[in-house]
Amino acid sequence: MIEATKILQLAQQIASMARPEKVILFGSYAYGQPTDDSDLDFLVILPFKGHWVYKAVEIRQQLPIDNFSLDLLVRSPEQVQERLAIGDLFMQEIINKGKVLYESAYARVGQ
């Protein structure tokens, strides 16, 4: 299991390097049901160009990940708003039930 301090530390590292609008923890660690096999799930909301996978890989490569799995979902604020507007249940769950670990002063999503 991953300690809460390590989770917060990773969120702050993402915030420092990527300057996102928000970093949201979702999945079993956010909902209080992690197991030894649980991975860490973050939604990182930030303006960017290109495909989200490339941005996720760029961020992931800069993080000190030791012995656990990390899933990064990277979306622009516009992409998140689009998914919410069409009723994407997965995105709604992340926004409504996830834990915001970092939020910039200029965040536009979920206000």
Enumerate the predicted regions with their spans.
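Catalytic core of pol beta-like nucleotidyltransferases
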Residues: 1-22, 31-36, 47-111
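Short beta-strand->loop micro-motif that forms the acidic, two-metal-ion catalytic signature
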Residues: 41-44
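Conserved H-loop
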Residues: 28
